[in-house]
């Protein structure tokens, strides 16, 4: 079958990256920026809130082991898609909930997935996740890649990232590495 790539933003990319790396079938996760207008932004640029970009991850996965919907299921489990421009302690448009489909099929599948969650009243509030076609993905600097793996004892990681990783292990145990 091959590999596919999903691009998702659900708050700080360190959290989303670490959660996605737990899934068996994920072959690579890259933190970066997308959804804005500034070419080749830096972390500082994106944190200023003026670029229009969100912190996102690109998740490459083996389609023999995972479906796009599996990736979406984990994504919607590890962040709150009902808060506008916020995830946990992180506030600003760069932390918005966003799915950036790579093609029309992913767009249809993401829209259907969100519609199913909404119909099932899966969350206490309305889902505010944006679904916008991916135009350009800009990888973040190397120091942001595999951040949790490199800094597991950093305060932000112990308070914010580790609980999301634990949640993936608990809820998706059979599908984790």
From Swiss-Prot:
<dbReference type="GO" id="GO:0008113">
    <property type="term" value="F:peptide-methionine (S)-S-oxide reductase activity"/>
</dbReference>
<dbReference type="InterPro" id="IPR002569">
    <property type="entry name" value="Met_Sox_Rdtase_MsrA_dom"/>
</dbReference>
<keyword id="KW-0560">Oxidoreductase</keyword>
<protein>
    <recommendedName>
        <fullName>Peptide methionine sulfoxide reductase MsrA</fullName>
        <ecNumber>1.8.4.11</ecNumber>
    </recommendedName>
</protein>
<dbReference type="InterPro" id="IPR036509">
    <property type="entry name" value="Met_Sox_Rdtase_MsrA_sf"/>
</dbReference>
<feature type="active site">
    <location>
        <position position="12"/>
    </location>
</feature>
<dbReference type="GO" id="GO:0036211">
    <property type="term" value="P:protein modification process"/>
</dbReference>
<dbReference type="GO" id="GO:0033744">
    <property type="term" value="F:L-methionine:thioredoxin-disulfide S-oxidoreductase activity"/>
</dbReference>
<comment type="function">
    <text>Has an important function as a repair enzyme for proteins that have been inactivated by oxidation. Catalyzes the reversible oxidation-reduction of methionine sulfoxide in proteins to methionine.</text>
</comment>
<dbReference type="Pfam" id="PF01625">
    <property type="entry name" value="PMSR"/>
</dbReference>
<comment type="similarity">
    <text>Belongs to the MsrA Met sulfoxide reductase family.</text>
</comment>
């Amino acid at each position: 079958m091959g590999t596919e790539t999903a691009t998702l933003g659900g708050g700080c990319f360190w959290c989303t990256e670490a959660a996605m790396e737990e899934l068996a079938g994920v072959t690579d996760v890259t933190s970066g920026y997308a959804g804005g207008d500034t070419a080749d932004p830096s972390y500082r640029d994106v944190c200023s809130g003026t670029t229009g970009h969100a912190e996102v991850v690109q998740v490459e996965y083996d389609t023999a082991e995972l479906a796009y919907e599996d990736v979406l299921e984990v994504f919607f489990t590890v962040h709150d898609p009902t808060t506008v421009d916020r995830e946990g302690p992180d506030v600003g448009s760069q932390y918005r909930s966003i799915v950036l489909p790579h093609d029309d099929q992913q767009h249809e599948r993401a829209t259907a997935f969100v519609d199913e969650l909404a119909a099932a009243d899966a969350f206490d509030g309305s889902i505010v996740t944006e679904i916008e076609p991916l135009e350009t993905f800009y990888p973040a600097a190397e120091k942001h890649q595999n951040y949790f793996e490199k800094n597991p004892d950093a305060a932000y990681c112990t308070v914010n990232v580790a609980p999301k990783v634990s949640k993936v292990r608990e809820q998706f145990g059979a599908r984790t590495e």
